[in-house]
Amino acid sequence: MAGHSKWANTKHRKAAQDAKRGKIFTKIIRELVTAARLGGGDPASNPRLRAAIDKALSNNMTRDTLNRAIARGVGSDEADNMETIIYEGYGPGGTAVMVECLSDNRNRTVSDVRHAFTKTGGNLGTDGSVAYLFAKKGVISYAPGLDEDAVMEAALEAGADDVETYDDGAIDVYTTPETFGDVKDALDAAGFVAESAEVSMIPSTKAELDAETAPKLLRLIDMLEDSDDVQEVYHNGEISDEIAALL
């Protein structure tokens, strides 16, 4: 299936995201520690840990760093007070937004999240207000330049649910959360190096943003990601190439 890839929507934010790499590493390490503490240090029997490892490697974290984080999780109780919290709300332009947090203080976290929504013209909703618009899936993304047919054949043979190809040559492979690790292993073994790989919340519908609402949504995302407690921000906003070029 051909279409418009997320590359155009994300490339203009790359410099800002690179500047946050230290914060990203801190969040990934927190997730590695928590996943190892709750489910053990073997990724083969701990899907949450496997997903965290894939995310760490996609962000160029060294094996040494991630192994130390796993060892910390297995050998300590520092993750005992951590809990995963999902907040839902509506952002600028009526976009549906889900915020995945890992926190030891709910009051602090909800205050940070609510502040970000309020400052950008959105509002924090109740449980279930937008969750029905998203599905949890594994997403393995490839940069333009690979043989699309070969990736598709290998992915479907490995058990992927769907493969989406885009006009610019980028490829997204979709899996269930349960088959994510096996499919990625098979694609790695076939020589296809992913640009990113993670279990994500994928929107079923998109909200097209205009020149006024697009920067507001990006500001909301940036404010949320600035919170140490926020691990992931999912949304259904879509920004056209023309508007992205202006941002």
Curated annotation (Swiss-Prot):
It is found in: Cytoplasm. GO terms for molecular function: DNA binding. Keywords: Cytoplasm, DNA-binding, Transcription, Transcription regulation. One of its GO terms (cellular component) is cytosol. One of its GO terms (biological process) is regulation of DNA-templated transcription. Its main location: cytoplasm. The keyword RNA-binding does not apply. Belongs to the TACO1 family. This is Probable transcriptional regulatory protein plu2109.
